[in-house]
UniProtKB/Swiss-Prot annotation:
Its main location: nucleus. Its EC number is 3.5.4.34. InterPro entries: A_deamin. It comes from Arabidopsis thaliana. This is tRNA-specific adenosine deaminase TAD1. One of its GO terms (molecular function) is tRNA-specific adenosine-37 deaminase activity.
Amino acid sequence: MEEDWGKTVSEKVISAYMSLPKKGKPQGREVTVLSAFLVSSPSQDPKVIALGTGTKCVSGSLLSPRGDIVNDSHAEVVARRALIRFFYSEIQRMQLTSGKSNEAKRQRIDSETSSILESADSSCPGEVKYKLKSGCLLHLYISQLPCGYASTSSPLYALKKIPSTQVDDSLLVQASDICSSRHSDVPEIGSNSNKGNGSQVADMVQRKPGRGETTLSVSCSDKIARWNVLGVQGALLYQVLQPVYISTITVGQSLHSPDNFSLADHLRRSLYERILPLSDELLTSFRLNKPLFFVAPVPPSEFQHSETAQATLTCGYSLCWNYSGLHEVILGTTGRKQGTSAKGALYPSTQSSICKQRLLELFLKETHGHKRESSKSKKSYRELKNKATEYYLMSKIFKGKYPFNNWLRKPLNCEDFLIN
């Protein structure tokens, strides 16, 4: 059953990827990472609804205060932002189909696919209107282990490569259970005790790897662990959509995996057991989500990375796609659409549909319709995110708890922008 599920999910995702045009895909010896979200129900097999590729991030010095670039173009993050746009499309679908005067619009909507969302109970807090439809499950696929604590460079993985005759069992216990200890004097990423891309406390939050200048993006392992507490929908959507959690996580097998290595156990330790210290501090709307972990077959060659980063030639582009019509190619090191010239870099036409500014526009359209706000009443991206009070407090608790209490924070001005 487990092998069948991993194979089914990977085949669905790879088929969706192969159906896309060549633009933005690896060329020659280049490789990339592929990630996707799928949805299933008792009456529907898994279907890909959002997809992303990529391995690049914007360096710290190139971060924008306008919210007009994609800071992190790793596959998992791109897929999740494409998923958020899909949620907005589904919300719009529900609004159109609920309006009796919109018969013509209803007929133009793709009738073969029902919405994955439904109306939330009236007892839900605040203005929450929607939730994941009863019986629907969300699934995540990644072609390889996510970067950070779950990656092949983690001490936990490295110990598994030592022959069992040469390693004491206590070392494995120590490596896998590091996160159960409660250190208080841990170094901040980027602090004097931990500069640049140097060694980092193994089980704590890690910076995304970068060649050359340091990035300010947190690893995918840490972000997925956070989704297992706060949901994948983010702070803005939380104001209208109940937390959405991942039911299964499927990861492609590697040609370089050590013998007797349990990928599913490794993922459980990395993405679930690290959040257990938060079990007594959860707020009402949230839970410790425990996905089921599955192994998929080795992916096609364009997703097979060498054992060492130095030997791997990675594609600089990220594909971004979702079922509601989104399809873009992003240059990962600039966070803008492929083909953007230096002269036109600030034009709105260069912005990706998944940058903060574009997602904020969707949120304002959902919550305010087409009403124009006066300049005095306008709120910044940060202020609007913080209106999700319970989400904001839960996020603060999460980032204050070991092993996440050295969560990297970007400059405050990166979220102070307004929408004109």
